[in-house]
Amino acid sequence: MLTIKQIRDDKEAAARKLAKKGVDAAPVIEKIISFDDRRKALQLELDNTLAAQNKAAKEIGALMGQGRREEAEERKRFVADLKEKSSRLEAELTDARQELQSAIVSLPNFPAEIVPEGKTAEDNLVVKLVESYTALPENPLPHWELARKYDIIDFDLGVKLTGAGFPVYKGKGARLQRALINYFLDCNTRAGYLEVEPPVMVNEASGFGTGQLPDKEGQMYHATADNFYLVPTAEVPVTNIYRDVILEKEDFPVKMTAYTPCFRREAGSYGKDVRGLNRLHQFDKVEIVQLSLPEKSYEALDGMVAHVESIVKALGLPYRILRLCGGDMSFTSALTYDFEVYSEAQKRWLEVSSVSNFESFQANRLKLRYRDEEKKIQLAHTLNGSSLALPRIVAALLENYQTPEGIRIPEALIPYTGFDIIK
């Protein structure tokens, strides 16, 4: 959530920044300033009314002590009128704050200066390309055919048990999943991230804190009886560990990693791009989260990008890194880098990680703050990234490591799988 100061300091600049995300924010900004002016005026009137009420209440006792009962009764009536007025003002102030809050939360985060202009994924900037292609057999198979051939992932059984987008991993397919999760977590903990195991259901406050609510409720599975949401990413529960927390400057950086199954409705997804593991309703993902001092957050982002790259590189997959354009960025992000691995069998790039700096946007919603050197309370910065998302990594491994003998396992994973080939 943007702060009032960010909007009021230069409303024209705020509108220009949000236009980069494809948002015509000028009308909303004018409403926000108007709502804020009303809130300030009501707050001032309420403060003055309460001050007059307190002063008059004190005068009643003095008048009674002097035997001036008639004047004291008059002051009592005056205080009663002020109490009625203050109650009315408090109700109006509550409404004004809610109007202001609703308007502010409708605006996305400002994009960073280096975010490219653009509206769609076609406008994203390729900042690195590593073409470590493996030699594939003639007419390589896509992963969904390999999964059927080696009986390691059963998509039809998932449909029987739940529905489309809920595959069942079997035998070496299940062991490969478990191996990847453990490998990713080990890579992250070796890099200084604290492993946590959070709940996979969160409340509304947690969804609001990281920006999934009210923006993405249509994409989340909602347990209406308890008003809980299944997590679309471990970012939500892990970042919310520090909701309503004030840290000391020396506590930074805070680095956490977690594995969770993730749940996304993906409403409206259809066509060839959703075949097999390309787009699922339930999938496994390992996440990294950092809390940073504002002046250190872009340095932290660079470190997270380098860390994710080291994992992708160790798997020996062809990959590229993209800097997302304004129109393709998330509601909450200030700057995002996507990692994609190449599928030779599908002839397309598959996203396997998204690493983002949210600056103070999430922290403002979370009330995640710290004390600076002068003991003033400031907003922290939050960052997170997939390290990594499993479905498309599994798809890329199956497709890029297929041979006439079977599917080879990258050397880095063999200690985790206990086997070097699927056949």
PLM features: what roles do these ranges have?
Residues 1-134, 148, 152, 156:
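N-terminal alpha-helical targeting/anchoring segments
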Residues 26, 129-423:
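TRNA-recognition modules of translation machinery and tRNA-sensing kinases, especially anticodon-binding
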